[in-house]
Each structure stands twice: as structure tokens, then as C-alpha cells.
């Protein structure tokens, strides 16, 4: 390259001067021309040449002007010009210098054009070439834009492109605007409510203050109008008069009348001064019945006062005016009605296996009985008294059972007392009216309310221990727990068999430590687990001992054994007073702890305190209890079915 430059520099035709360097960008593979004079970068050669001629002509001394566009420059268009401007890194000072130098160059060209006519002709031809080039450039740009738009359009004309969203940021409501909007909305609602209230009050005041207009003095008033004119209130103690029919409405049959004398009295218009006597017709006091009726009619058109005298027919009934208020002349007091008998007592005697009602249940119901329903109390009281006697019989002396007695209303309504009697009502009246019987009944009622089924501990233990009567304990060989004199009634062989049964039961019961050691196991077993163990114990006892005991009977036996062992340990039962069989059973159950739990025979509940267990027994809804297996039932039908199937 250096030799080529030397050759060119040696010749006189060619003079070369180094104006810049070629710079290559490795990032985007772009080539730029670097100017040595002003240190600017240019991406295209024509721009670089124009820059040298315009800005550095004083240094380089050009002989020809470079004003001809190249093909690349014509094809590039406005995009390449914008791109070249982006790649230029000339400072504002250099651009200012370039503008000043361009202005100087233009001035120099103008001076030269004034001096030489040849240059002016060349300049005109160059301007024409520049205009043609600009026109062609504009046409090419428009064609390129249309070609690009055709490419961007899809084949199907249904697609409209992405929707242009309007700039709604300025119109959107902010939080403060939303708050003010809600405040204004609520205030408008409140103001509308207040406005409606004010309007309603005004309307009500107007309707209250509204009065009827008084009639003119010369106006003609009918008989019924004085009531409306005087503003008489709607509620009046006097009955209004009946309207008198007009002359046109009067129709008289000749057949129904015996005599018809009609007299017409013509009076002047001034005779109407007698109208103040009209309000006298409003007095509704009963008047004596006259043989004829007098009707006065005021004609509105002619102003004639007409009076008709009509005689009564034979078939007509005289009508009397009703007076108010009604006068009561006589009050008849009727005797109280005697109601028929509601029900009678049954004549059947109780069977031996009849259900025994739970005493604790009846006592608890009597204690918590409401005051307004003494009906159930007296009924249950009578049933308990009769069942304790063992049978129900008719009594000639006292055959009556009171069904409902209210002490507060005995004097006021004695006739409303409902009774159930098998004898005549005279016997009931003589006994019910006696103060002695009523006093005894009230004393029994007060004593029964004061009685507490859980007050005395020994009574509770005795009740619980005597539920099964010894018959269930005989099945497992443990009757000595409740009866100390059982040895005197049994033979030696029977005693030995009873001890064997007790030994078998104690061995089986020893296996189920989760039942008899419930309070010492930590954590205690769940009721579901204990109930499963209880069913397993019942099944094993029935299989080994050849009996048919229910689950409730096994629970009853366990409770009695635990209470008996606890009483001996706490010295409530002296060892010297018990029999040898009881001592033998005590040795069999020596593994039992002092603390034990109560198992309810009706459900799966377990209690550690005696008071809670007794309270639970009282609250049980089972009223009927079998005397053989101590199983309880809520309804008598279930009890009867049990007796037919289990104890035939």
C-alpha cells in the first residue's frame, strides 16, 4: 500500500492527502470514517466528502465540488440519514463550527457565482439534478411503505389487530375520588330520606287541619246533612236517624192499605224557618207506637213542604228504635255444670311379675314438679301408695283419686276440679269439702318436696344393694353379701356348691383388671373399651357357669361386691357380725382395691363418686324394672315383650 501511495504521490496528476482513517466496530460489524481535523465519525463516504468540502476546504483546497448523489445514497432514503445521524459522535462545538464553515462556503460560492457566469450555469444544472433525485427518493419511499403494509396485513381480513387502549389513566378514579363518591352517595340517600319524612309530616298536618267549608245560609239542607255540617265525630253514643224516603220513592199498594188519607200542605219559602226544629229528630229515645206514620219530605226543586199520613197495614210489625247503652234489668246465675266421668279405675289385680316403678324416679319428679301442674304429682302419688299396698282394690270408704287440685283456685273455681271416681259424686263432694283431708294432702305434699333422695348415705347404699334381692347373687354363689343368715336356710351340699360358684366367678373376674382397677389405671380406659370388656366378662361367666345373665346383671353384681368390700374396709360392717361364708368370699376378692367405680346398668357411663351415680340413677328415664333380671324399660310395651320372650 505504501508503494502504491508513493507512486501516486510522485506523479503530478494525482495529489493525495490523508484526511482520516477507516474504523471497524467488532460488535455490529460497522465501518466508519474518522476525520483527522475535527475527529468525527461518518458511516458513508459521500457524507464524509461533503463534510471535508464544507468544513475543511480551507485546508485541503478542493478544485471540484462533490454534489453528485451516488446510487447507494439514492436507495438509502431517510432511514440511512437518521442512522448516520445516530452514529455520529460530533460534539456541539464541532457542529457549530461546521455550520459556520458551511455559511462561509456558501458566501464564497455566491461571490464566485457573481464573478464567473460559467459557474452559475453549472449550479442551475446541479439544482435540477438534485430536484429529480429528491422526487425519485420520495417515490421509492412511498412504494416501500406500501409494500411493508401489504406484508403486515393478514390473509383473512377479519383480524383487526390489537385493540388500542385509550389513555384512561387521567380519567380513572383514585382512592380519594372513590371515597368522596361514596360519601356523596350516602349523603344523597340520607337527604332523600329526610325529605320524604318532612313531606309526610306536612301531608299529615294538612290532612289534620283540613276542615269542611261551611254551607251558605240560603242553601237547602237535607235531613242527613246537619250531622256532616256540625262535624260530629264518627263515634257517637246515639244512633243516627233513618233517612226518610222522597216522594218519588214512595209506593203504596191499594190492597195492603185500609185507609189512605193524603193531605198536602203548601207553604211559602219563608216557612223554612222552622228547620231549626229538625235536630230534635236526632233524639233516639223510644216513642209510643202511633197508628200512623208521619213522613216529612223537603223537595229541593220547588221548596214545598209535603206531609204524608199513611195508615199502617194489618200485616206490618211496629219497629222500635234501639237505645244505647243496653239496660240490664236482670242477671240469671246458673249453677255449675257437672261434667261426665272421664275415666274409671281398672278392676284387674296386678300380676306377680308386674313392673315396679322406680321409687327414686318418682321422688325426683315430685321434688322438681312445677307449681302450675300438680296433676301429675297427685296421680303418681296415688299410684305409688296403691302399688306399695301390693294390689289395687275398690274402697267403699275412699274410692276417689284426685286428678287435679289447685290450692290457689279452690275457692274461686271448685266446679272445675277434674276427678276420677267409681262411686257417686255425692261421696266426693262430702270428702273434698272436708278441711281435714285437704290439710293432710297438703302436709304430705310439703313433706314430699322437702325429702331429698340423696340426703342420707346409708339409705343410698341400702337402696343400691337391695336392687337385685339376692336372686342374682345366688347364680354366682354370692348371696352372703346381702343376707348374713343364708347359711341357716341352706344345707351343707348347697353351701359347698355356692362356694364353688363364688370361686369360679372370682377367678374369671380377676382377669379383667381394667374393670375392677379402673381408677388406678393411668390413663383410665375409655367407656367404649370398658363396655367391650364388660360384654366379654358376661359372655365368659355365662359359658363357664352355665347361666343366662344379661350385661346389666353383671354390672349390678360388680357394684354390690365393690360396695360391700368398701364397707368392710372402712369398718362400716364389723367382721364379727358377718358369717363364715361372707368371710370366705372376702378372702376370694382380696385382690380388689379400696377405690372403685360405679357402672351404670342402663348405659355405658362410669362414675367415681357415689353422689354422681345416685343422681344419674334418679335421672334415668326407665320406669319399669324386671324383678328377675333387674333390667329396666322406658315403656310398658317393651317390658311386656321382655317378659314374653326372656321369662315365659
From Swiss-Prot:
PROSITE patterns: ZINC_FINGER_C2H2_1, ZINC_FINGER_C2H2_2. One of its GO terms (molecular function) is zinc ion binding. Residues 76-127, 146-170 are annotated as: Disordered. GO terms for biological process: male meiosis chromosome separation; male meiosis I. InterPro entries: Znf_C2H2_type. GO terms for cellular component: autosome; nucleus. Its main location: nucleus. Residues 85-94 have a biased composition (Polar residues). Keywords: Cell cycle, Chromosome, Chromosome partition, Meiosis, Metal-binding, Nucleus, Repeat, Zinc, Zinc-finger. Coiled coil: none annotated. Residues 96-107 have a biased composition (Basic and acidic residues). A zinc finger (C2H2-type) spans 33-56, 598-620, 624-647. It is found in: Nucleus; Chromosome. Disulfide bonds: none annotated. Drosophilid specific gene duplication generates rgr and tef. Teflon has a function unique to Drosophilids. Specifically required in males for proper segregation of autosomal bivalents at meiosis I. Expression is required in the male germ line prior to spermatocyte stage S4. May have a role as a bridging molecule maintaining adhesion to hold autosome bivalents together via heterochromatic connections. Belongs to the Teflon family. This is Protein teflon. The lineage of its organism: Eukaryota, Metazoa, Ecdysozoa, Arthropoda, Hexapoda.
Amino acid at each position: 500500500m505504501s508503494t502504491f501511495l508513493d507512486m501516486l504521490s510522485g506523479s503530478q496528476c494525482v495529489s493525495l492527502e490523508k484526511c482520516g482513517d477507516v474504523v471497524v466496530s467488532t460488535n455490529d460489524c460497522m465501518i466508519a470514517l474518522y476525520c483527522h481535523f475535527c475527529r468525527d465519525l461518518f458511516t458513508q463516504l459521500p457524507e464524509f466528502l461533503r463534510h471535508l468540502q464544507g468544513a475543511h476546504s480551507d485546508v485541503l483546497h478542493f478544485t471540484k465540488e462533490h454534489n453528485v448523489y451516488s446510487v447507494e445514497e439514492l436507495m438509502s432514503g431517510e432511514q440511512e440519514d437518521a442512522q448516520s445521524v445516530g452514529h455520529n459522535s460530533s460534539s456541539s462545538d464541532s457542529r457549530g463550527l461546521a455550520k459556520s464553515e458551511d455559511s462561509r462556503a456558501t458566501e464564497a460560492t455566491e461571490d464566485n457565482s457573481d464573478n464567473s457566469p460559467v459557474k452559475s450555469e453549472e449550479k442551475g444544472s446541479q439544482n435540477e439534478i438534485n430536484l429529480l433525485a429528491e422526487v425519485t427518493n420520495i417515490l421509492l419511499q412511498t412504494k416501500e411503505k406500501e409494500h411493508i403494509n401489504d406484508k403486515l396485513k393478514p390473509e383473512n381480513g377479519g383480524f383487526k389487530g390489537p385493540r388500542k387502549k385509550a389513555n384512561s389513566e387521567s380519567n380513572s378514579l383514585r382512592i380519594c375520588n372513590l371515597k368522596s363518591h361514596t360519601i356523596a352517595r350516602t349523603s344523597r340517600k340520607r337527604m332523600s330520606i329526610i325529605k320524604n319524612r318532612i313531606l309526610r309530616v306536612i301531608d299529615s298536618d294538612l290532612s289534620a287541619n283540613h276542615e269542611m267549608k261551611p254551607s251558605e245560609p240560603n242553601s237547602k239542607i237535607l235531613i242527613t246533612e246537619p250531622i256532616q255540617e256540625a262535624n260530629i265525630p264518627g263515634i257517637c253514643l246515639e244512633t243516627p236517624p233513618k233517612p226518610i224516603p222522597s216522594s218519588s220513592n214512595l209506593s203504596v199498594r191499594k190492597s195492603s192499605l185500609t185507609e189512605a188519607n193524603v193531605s198536602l200542605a203548601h207553604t211559602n219559602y219563608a216557612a223554612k224557618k222552622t228547620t231549626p226544629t229538625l235536630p230534635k229528630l236526632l233524639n233516639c229515645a223510644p216513642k209510643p207506637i202511633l197508628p200512623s206514620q208521619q213522613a216529612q219530605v223537603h223537595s229541593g226543586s220547588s221548596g214545598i213542604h209535603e206531609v204524608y199520613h199513611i195508615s199502617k197495614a194489618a200485616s206490618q210489625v211496629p219497629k222500635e228504635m234501639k237505645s244505647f247503652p243496653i239496660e240490664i234489668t236482670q242477671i240469671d246465675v246458673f249453677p255449675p255444670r257437672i261434667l261426665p266421668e272421664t275415666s274409671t279405675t281398672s278392676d284387674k289385680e296386678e300380676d306377680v311379675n308386674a313392673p315396679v316403678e322406680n321409687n327414686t324416679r318418682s321422688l325426683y319428679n315430685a321434688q322438681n314438679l312445677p307449681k302450675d301442674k300438680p296433676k301429675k304429682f297427685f296421680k303418681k302419688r296415688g299410684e305409688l301408695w296403691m302399688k306399695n299396698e301390693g294390689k289395687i282394690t275398690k274402697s267403699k270408704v275412699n274410692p276417689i283419686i284426685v286428678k287435679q287440685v289447685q290450692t290457689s283456685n279452690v275457692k274461686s273455681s271448685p266446679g272445675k276440679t277434674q276427678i276420677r271416681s267409681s262411686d257417686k259424686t255425692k261421696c266426693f263432694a262430702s270428702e273434698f269439702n272436708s278441711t281435714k283431708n285437704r290439710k293432710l294432702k297438703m302436709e304430705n305434699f310439703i313433706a314430699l318436696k322437702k325429702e331429698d333422695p340423696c340426703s342420707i348415705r346409708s339409705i343410698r347404699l341400702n337402696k343400691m344393694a337391695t336392687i337385685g334381692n339376692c336372686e342374682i347373687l345366688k347364680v354366682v354363689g354370692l348371696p352372703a353379701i346381702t343376707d348374713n343368715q343364708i347359711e341357716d336356710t341352706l344345707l351343707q351340699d348347697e353351701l359347698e356348691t355356692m362356694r364353688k360358684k363364688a370361686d369360679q366367678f372370682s377367678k374369671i373376674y380377676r382377669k379383667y383388671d381394667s374393670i375392677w382397677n379402673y381408677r388406678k389405671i393411668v390413663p383410665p380406659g375409655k367407656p367404649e373399651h370398658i363396655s367391650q370388656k364388660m360384654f366379654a366378662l358376661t359372655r365368659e361367666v355365662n359359658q363357664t357357669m352355665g347361666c343366662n345373665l344379661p350385661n346389666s346383671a353383671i354390672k349390678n353384681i360388680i357394684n354390690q361386691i365393690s360396695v360391700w368390700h368398701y364397707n368392710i374396709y372402712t369398718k362400716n360392717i364389723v367382721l364379727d357380725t358377718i358369717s363364715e361364708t361372707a368371710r370366705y368370699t372376702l378372702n376370694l376378692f382380696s385382690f380388689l382395691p379400696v377405690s372403685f367405680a360405679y357402672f351404670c346398668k342402663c348405659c355405658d357411663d362410669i362414675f367415681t363418686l357415689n353422689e354422681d351415680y345416685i343422681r344419674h340413677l334418679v335421672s334415668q328415664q326407665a320406669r319399669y324394672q324386671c324383678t328377675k333380671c333387674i333390667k329396666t324399660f322406658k315403656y310398658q310395651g317393651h317390658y311386656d315383650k321382655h317378659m314374653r320372650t326372656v321369662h315365659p
